[in-house]
């Protein structure tokens, strides 16, 4: 008998459900969402559902978490302060697709480099300017985003920037080519900025949720619901929190389809 545990943190309530063999709901429970530390509400809901089902935490084979945290953070303009490294673009490109608004005064660097549509280097990466920028900003931001011209055709400049960010600052970095395959540079940059902004809060939520589940006795791996309803590992969600946007609504739709047999 495989027991699956699902937890959803909403704006008001945190819900937990236990499903047996992917076919039968054996118990559900609810707790108030604890906004200061969402994991507290997660723990309360999980304890309630285990008690209602009269099963031990060790019987849970997989745990999944859906959350509106990323969605709410972007809508409310929350998240960490980040810096954008914009390689091979012009200053005016910041005005495209809401990129300047997303930065909202956060620092950025227009850096020499980039490639053409065929992946050929247009100009060398200006590493001296990059290192100077990283040194100045490393204590001022929680993370970095990098978008290079035509990085989806040749990501080497983004990869080099990411390596230097790690070396000089030790901060997390979101590279646009790892988040989107689209050619549109400003859109990729926007995705990278939003991802970088969310990394800290999603990392804290997942870490605390894992700690709470471990304390309860749940040893099963924690999965996170993606915005399309699929499950990704906790490690993937930590690196790409942008994929958890619409996690909560997606979980609701998947659940409704399962319950109705649609």
Task: Label each residue range with its predicted role.
Residues 1-262:
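N-terminally biased helix-coil "hinge/interface" segments that flank
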